[in-house]
C-alpha cells in the first residue's frame, strides 16, 4: 500500500519539513480513503510564521501599492496556469463537484486580480480645519500582521478573500486552512514560492483550530484575525483575540430564509432555491436554509420543488460529471444532518423526499424536503448545512418577515416577487446583511459580504472589505 503524501508548512519563504510525531489524515469524503497527511502543527509553528510575517511587514508596506498589486497579479496568473490541478485537489479532498471546483478556482484568480485593481483607488482625505494655516490629513495605513483561519467549504477562494486585500494594503499574512481541506492551500503556497514573493509576506501553517488557530488569534503581534467558520469557533476566536484587544473579522453561520410570494415566478423561484440549497451539497452559509411560501401558491410551489429536488443527481465527483452534488465533508457532518432531520420529524415535520443517509462508502445525504413544519421547530432555527429544505406556509408579507427575522443569524435572505413595492418593503423589514431578489444567494466580489447578529463582525469583498485591512492615521499639520 502506498504511503499518502505528507505535506510541509510554508514559513518565511520556504517549505518547512515537519519533525513532529503527530500527523492528521486528510480523507476523501466520497470514498473515505486517506489521500494525504498534514502536520498536527502546534502553537510554536504558528509563532514562527507570525514572527516571519512581522519581520517582512515594514519592507512590504514600504512598497508602492501598485508594486504590491503586481505580485497579486502574478499569483492570479499562476493559479490559472495550474487550474486543472487545483480543481482536481478540491474535488478529491472536499467532495465538490467538478464544475463547481473549476468555478471556484477561476473565481479565485479573478478575485485576486480585482483586488489588485484597488492599488490606485483606496485613498485618504484632506479635511478642512477650523484653525488658520492648519491642514488635517487623514492617511489609510496597513494594520501590520494579519491572520486568516479558513473553513473547508470554499477553501481555495477563502485564501484569496483574506490574502488579497491584506497584501494589497501593505499587511502580511499567516493562513491556516481547515485540516479537512489543506491540499489546495499547499498548491497555493507552491505558486507563491514559484513567483518569488518576498519571504514572510505569505505564510501557511497546518494543524487544528484549538492549537494553531488559537495562537493565530491570541498572539500579541497579530493586528487582525479574519476567520470564517461556525459560530462556536468564532466565539472562541473572539474570546482569545479579546485578551490583546485584537481586531476580528468574523464570517460565521447562517440560516437564510427564502420568501416566495403569491405573484412570484414559480419556475424561477424553484430553480434559484434548489440551486442555492444543493450547491456544495448544501454546505454554504449564505444559501437558502428555510423556505416561506405564501398560501395562495403553496401547493403548486411544493409540487414543483419536489420535482426539482428529486431530479438532483449526486455521487462521486471524481468519477461523474453529470451530478449536482457530492458527499458531505465528513462523518460528523453527515451525522449532524441526520440528527437535525430526525429531530424535526420528532417535532412533527413530515419527510416527503429523502430523509435518510445513503448506505455504503462516502458521506452522502440525498436532497430532502420537510413539510408540516412550524416556525418554532429547531430545523427553522439551527443551521443544518446539508441539502435539506423545510417549508412553511404564510399569509402576509409581514408574517413572513417576522418569521424570517426570528433567528440568531443574519447573513443572507431572499424574496421572490414581481411587485417592486413588495420587494422594497421586504428590504426595509428584513434584518440581514444581504438580501437577494429573484435570484440565487451567491454574492459578487465587488459587493460586501457581511452578516448581522451571530453571523459575524466586519465583512469581505469590494471597497468596504478592503478597508477592513486598513486603519486611519490623522495628522494635524500647522504651517
Placement of each model-derived feature along the sequence:
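Hydrophobic face of amphipathic alpha-helices that form TPR/SEL1-like repeat modules
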Residues: 1-30
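Conserved C-terminal structural/oligomerization subdomain of aldehyde/semialdehyde dehydrogenase
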Residues: 31-37, 222, 259, 313, ...
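Residue-level signal for inorganic ion chemistry
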Residues: 32, 68, 90, 112, ...
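Glycine-rich loop-to-alpha-helix module at the N-terminal edge of alpha/beta enzyme cores
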Residues: 33-122, 133
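Short, well-ordered beta-strand elements within core beta-sheets of diverse protein domains
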Residues: 35-41, 56-62, 147-148, 258-261, ...
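Structural signal for hydrophobic packing residues in well-ordered secondary-structure cores
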Residues: 57, 61, 76-83, 87, ...
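Rossmann-like NAD(P) dinucleotide-binding subdomain of oxidoreductase/dehydrogenase enzymes
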Residues: 124-268, 322, 394
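ALDH superfamily catalytic-core signature
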Residues: 232-374, 403, 437
Amino acid at each position: 500500500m502506498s504511503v499518502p503524501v505528507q505535506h510541509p508548512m510554508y514559513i518565511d519563504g520556504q517549505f518547512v519539513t515537519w519533525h513532529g510525531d503527530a500527523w492528521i489524515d486528510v480523507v476523501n469524503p466520497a470514498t473515505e480513503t486517506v489521500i494525504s497527511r498534514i502536520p498536527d502543527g502546534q502553537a510554536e509553528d504558528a509563532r514562527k510564521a507570525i514572527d516571519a510575517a512581522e519581520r517582512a511587514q515594514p519592507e512590504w508596506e514600504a512598497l508602492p501599492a501598485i508594486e504590491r498589486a503586481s505580485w497579486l497579479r502574478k499569483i492570479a496568473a499562476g493559479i490559472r496556469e495550474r487550474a486543472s490541478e487545483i480543481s482536481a485537489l478540491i474535488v478529491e479532498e472536499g467532495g465538490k463537484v467538478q464544475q463547481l471546483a473549476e468555478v471556484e478556482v477561476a473565481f479565485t484568480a479573478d478575485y485576486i486580480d480585482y483586488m489588485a485593481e484597488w492599488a490606485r483607488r483606496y485613498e485618504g482625505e484632506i479635511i478642512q480645519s477650523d484653525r488658520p494655516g492648519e491642514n488635517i490629513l487623514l492617511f489609510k495605513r496597513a494594520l501590520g500582521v494579519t491572520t486568516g483561519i479558513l473553513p473547508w467549504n470554499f477553501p481555495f477562494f477563502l485564501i484569496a478573500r483574506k490574502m488579497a486585500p491584506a497584501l494589497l494594503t501593505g499587511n502580511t499574512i499567516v493562513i491556516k486552512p481547515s485540516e479537512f481541506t489543506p491540499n489546495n492551500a499547499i498548491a497555493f503556497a507552491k505558486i507563491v514560492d514559484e513567483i518569488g514573493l518576498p519571504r514572510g509576506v505569505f505564510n501557511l501553517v497546518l494543524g487544528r483550530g484549538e492549537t494553531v488557530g488559537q495562537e493565530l488569534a491570541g498572539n500579541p503581534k497579530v493586528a487582525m484575525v479574519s476567520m470564517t467558520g461556525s459560530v462556536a469557533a468564532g466565539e472562541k476566536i473572539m474570546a482569545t483575540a479579546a485578551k490583546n484587544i485584537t481586531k476580528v473579522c468574523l464570517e460565521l453561520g447562517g440560516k437564510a430564509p427564502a420568501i416566495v410570494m403569491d405573484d412570484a415566478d414559480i419556475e424561477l423561484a424553484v430553480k434559484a432555491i434548489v440551486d442555492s440549497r444543493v450547491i456544495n451539497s448544501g454546505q454554504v452559509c449564505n444559501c437558502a436554509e428555510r423556505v416561506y411560501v405564501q398560501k395562495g401558491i403553496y401547493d403548486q410551489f411544493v409540487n414543483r420543488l419536489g420535482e426539482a429536488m428529486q431530479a438532483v443527481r449526486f455521487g462521486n465527483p471524481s468519477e461523474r460529471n453529470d451530478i449536482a452534488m457530492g458527499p458531505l465533508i465528513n462523518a460528523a457532518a453527515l451525522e449532524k444532518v441526520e440528527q437535525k432531520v430526525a429531530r424535526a420529524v420528532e417535532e412533527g415535520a413530515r419527510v416527503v423526499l429523502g430523509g435518510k443517509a445513503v448506505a455504503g462508502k462516502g458521506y452522502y445525504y440525498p436532497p430532502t424536503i420537510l413539510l408540516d413544519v412550524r416556525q418554532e421547530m429547531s430545523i427553522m432555527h439551527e443551521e443544518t448545512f446539508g441539502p435539506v429544505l423545510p417549508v412553511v406556509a404564510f399569509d402576509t408579507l409581514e408574517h413572513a418577515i417576522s418569521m424570517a427575522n426570528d433567528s440568531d443569524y443574519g447573513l443572507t435572505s431572499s424574496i421572490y416577487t414581481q411587485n417592486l413595492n413588495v420587494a422594497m418593503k421586504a428590504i426595509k423589514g428584513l434584518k440581514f446583511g444581504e438580501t437577494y431578489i429573484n435570484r440565487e444567494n451567491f454574492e459578487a466580489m465587488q459587493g460586501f459580504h457581511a452578516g448581522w447578529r451571530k453571523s459575524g463582525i466586519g465583512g469581505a469583498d469590494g471597497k468596504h472589505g478592503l478597508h477592513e485591512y486598513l486603519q486611519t492615521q490623522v495628522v494635524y499639520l500647522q504651517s
